[in-house]
Amino acid sequence: LVRCHISGEQPLCYMDGIILDDCTFDAACDRCFEDSKNINADIVGAITEIKNPISGRIAAHNVGKVTYDEFAKGKQAMITLR
């Protein structure tokens, strides 16, 4: 997905190989990328919450919260701020 706006509750969960380029997230989005793997995401702006991503990389200007709970299937995702 290129230059798209993501909205909704728990978006982009259970995905494999998702590519996001210059996308934005609505502030109401929470628990993004849960159980997703091989993520390649370049986000413009902020992500409210990322929950239990398995692997890949997520870059954003701001991340409000990163959650790994007891149900996390992996912790190999690299989350960076720009």
Language model segments and positions:
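Residue-level detector of solvent-exposed, low-hydrophobicity positions
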Residues: I18-I19, C32, K75-M78
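Short "repeat-start/strand-capping" segments in structured domains, especially the N-termini
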Residues: M15-I19, D35-N40
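Terminal non-domain segments
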Residues: N38-R82
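Short glycine/acidic-rich loop motifs that flank beta-strands on beta-rich extracellular proteins
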Residues: G8-Y14, A28-E34, K51-S55
